[in-house]
Regions:
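Short amphipathic helix-loop junctions that connect adjacent transmembrane helices
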Residues: 31-48, 236-254
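Structural signature of the two symmetry-related core transmembrane helices
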Residues: 80-95, 174, 285-299
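Cytoplasmic helix-loop-helix junction between adjacent transmembrane helices
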Residues: 108-146
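Paired small-residue
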Residues: 103-111, 308-316
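Intracellular juxtamembrane helix-capping segments at the cytosolic ends
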Residues: 118-130, 323-336
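Conserved MFS/SLC helix-loop-helix module at the cytosolic interface between two early adjacent transmembrane helices
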Residues: 64-100, 278
Length: 344
């Protein structure tokens, strides 16, 4: 993409929109298993099954559809494609608010995943407009914005759910996503990659190209495993905490939101400091240390027998995750030609 002289403005705008979009997309995590009880899923085992299915289908479909949308963003411009994503998130949030069965919620979340891919497109925009020497720092900013959405989403969603009922967070998330869409349309400039109108490769050809790069394969694998570990407990976390508390608390969604908030806050702070740390420590060494650290904190989470011990070590895990993602993304960006960064 063209190196715009106003690249800082684009970076800050993308980060701000990512925070809002992240809250809108992740805000349901703190109360989703509890909401299922309101639409007829009463058994704990059945609620856990549906929570895992509904929570997992969206990122799964995003993983399948993201390469297609990234290539479309490269050809047609990221502004148009991100607008489609935000419009879909807005509509689906409102549809979930009036859903009456777990199957309806499942289908809506599946459709959201099909038009997903906001984060990789945002990453490609940041990597493309940032000067080479600023890439690590700006990707750290975007990672912090992404984590902030993950951090505030469940907290806000949990608070709204515990005070206004389990349907109102969907409405809140829909309105917030609509605001992000309006800001994107008003303030985001059109960005086109030089030569984008030339020879075009298919999605499969692009995937084969990146899969042939060993560093890209390694970094994608590390990101997948770390995200799998940190989010694997997400769908059942409210039920797990409810069991820890003996089912006696009326603010379970808020407690879940606080725990996720603490983990996200630690991750965001570390992401913001990535640029300063990588100026003193090599990227591979920092990535190795962070992954080992995260592995140890996962073991400590398993050993906890109370809610706040679990919350503490999930927050500590966020420290390592805050370094892993921007460092891995920087290494990926360095491994591909500049003209390919808008796709990878």
């Amino acid at each position: 993409m063209e190196r715009n002289t106003g690249w800082k403005r684009i970076v800050y705008l993308m980060c701000a929109i990512q925070v809002g979009a992240g809250i809108a997309m992740i805000g349901v995590m703190a109360f989703l298993p509890l909401f299922l009880g309101e639409i007829g899923v009463t058994a704990a085992g059945e609620a856990a099954f549906w929570a895992g299915l509904i929570s997992g289908v969206t990122p799964f479909m995003i993983a399948l559809s993201a390469p297609f949308w990234s290539i479309q963003a490269d050809r047609r411009g990221p502004k148009l494609v991100m607008s489609i994503v935000l419009a879909a998130v807005t509509l689906i949030a409102f549809l979930c608010a009036v859903s009456t069965s777990p199957w309806q919620v499942f289908i809506f979340r599946l459709l959201q995943g099909l038009v997903g891919g906001f984060v990789p497109i945002g990453l490609s925009v940041i990597a493309s407009v940032s000067p080479e020497e600023e890439t690590s720092r700006t990707l750290g900013y975007f990672q912090a914005a992404m984590v902030s959405g993950i951090m505030f989403g469940p907290l806000v969603g949990g608070l709204v759910a515990d005070t206004l009922g389990y349907r109102m967070p969907f409405v809140f998330c829909g309105v917030l996503s609509l605001i992000c869409l309006i800001c994107l349309r008003l303030f985001m400039p059109e960005i086109h990659r030089k030569g984008a109108s030339g020879e075009k490769s298919s999605t499969w050809q692009e995937l084969k190209y990146f899969a042939a790069i060993s560093r890209v394969r390694l970094m994608v694998g590390i990101q997948f495993l770390c995200n799998f570990g940190i989010t694997g407990i997400g769908p059942i976390l409210p039920l797990y905490i409810k069991d820890m508390l003996g089912g006696g608390s009326e603010i379970i969604a808020t407690i879940v939101g606080i725990i996720i908030f603490l983990a996200g806050g630690a991750s965001a702070l570390c992401s913001l400091s990535t640029g300063a740390v990588t100026a003193r420590v090599s990227l591979p060494r920092l990535l190795t240390a962070a992954t080992v650290f995260v592995g140890l904190t996962f073991i400590m989470q398993y050993m906890m027998t109370n809610v706040w011990g679990l919350g503490f070590f999930r927050a500590v895990t966020g420290i390592g995750m805050g370094f892993i993602m921007p460092v891995a993304n920087t290494l990926i960006a360095q491994a591909v030609p500049n003209e390919k960064r808008s796709i990878v």
